[in-house]
Structure formats: structure tokens, C-alpha cells
Amino acid sequence: YQHSKEEKSDFQLEAAADMGALMIDGLTDGIWLMNNGDIPAQTIDETAFGILQAARLRTSKTEYISCPGCGRTLYDLRETIAKIKEATKHLKGLKIGIMGCIVNGPGEMADADYGYVGAGPNKVSLYRKQVCVEKNIPQEVAVEHLLALIDADKK
């Protein structure tokens, strides 16, 4: 599909809207994007792979599930999401849930491979699938504990 967009976000939105529905409905299983604007080839490739992953046709990167945070979130959710993404972006095929609280977190991340869920003021619990494997970890070291859990499971 060919686009004529100058802005990355406009290109991504239009490409996803045009191609995503066809893929979800099973009418195609591949994608070729082109752009007549100034969008770099790397962005075009990343967009195509992102659409394929969203349609569950090809996994090419780590996937993250997160809540927007609310009054029950007792740690810096945005900063934590950024830290976890940076530390795990190379783990192709994993799905990691990052949730603000214990109330809705475990249910919202039910299909994640690993979960990072707020447990109290600056405390976090870690999950493997839907099973809590470590409780009330201080937030300052919780990302390292998550990475250690993932590494231990690789062995």
C-alpha cells in the first residue's frame, strides 16, 4: 500500500487503519508499505512489523500491556514503564504486563508472560503468567528482580 505522508505518526496511523482491518479479518497475511513522503525506510519497516504483530501474524518485538494508572497506583508508573521497556526491548516474543495496582492488574495482564504489579507504597509484586512469584519488592530493585526472573526461566 502506498502513502504520501510527511509525519511519522500520520503515516503510522493511516497504514494501520488501512491494513490492520484486512489482517484481523484474515483477508491478507502480509504487508508491503511504501511512502512518497520523507518517512525513513526504517520507520516504514517498523510500522509494517508493528501492524503484523498487532494482528498476531508475526512477532518481532517485546509486547507490553499496561494500565493508565489511577489513584491506586502508588509508584511512578510512567518512569517504570520506560525502564522496563529499555531493559527488555531485546526479548522478542515476550509479553510483559506493567500494572499500577493489585485490584485490576492481574486480570488485565492475564495473558502476559511476566507481570510487574504495584502492591503498596513503592512496593511491587512480580508474576510469572498469572502466578505471583515474588511479593512486596522495593520499587528501587524490582526491575532488576524482573530481569533476574526472566533470565532464570531461560535456563
Residue positions per predicted region:
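Beta-strand/loop-dominated core regions that host nucleotide or nucleotide-derived cofactor-binding catalytic loops
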Residues: 121-127, 132-154
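A C-terminal functional module that forms or caps the active site or interfaces directly
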Residues: 103-111, 120
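Short, surface-exposed acidic/glycine-rich loop or hinge patches that mediate macromolecular interfaces
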Residues: 38-39, 103, 140
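Short, well-ordered beta-strand core segments
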Residues: 115-116
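Solvent-exposed, flexible loop/coil residues
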Residues: 17, 106-107, 131, 137
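Domain-level signal for soluble alpha/beta catalytic cores
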Residues: 5, 103-104, 128, 137
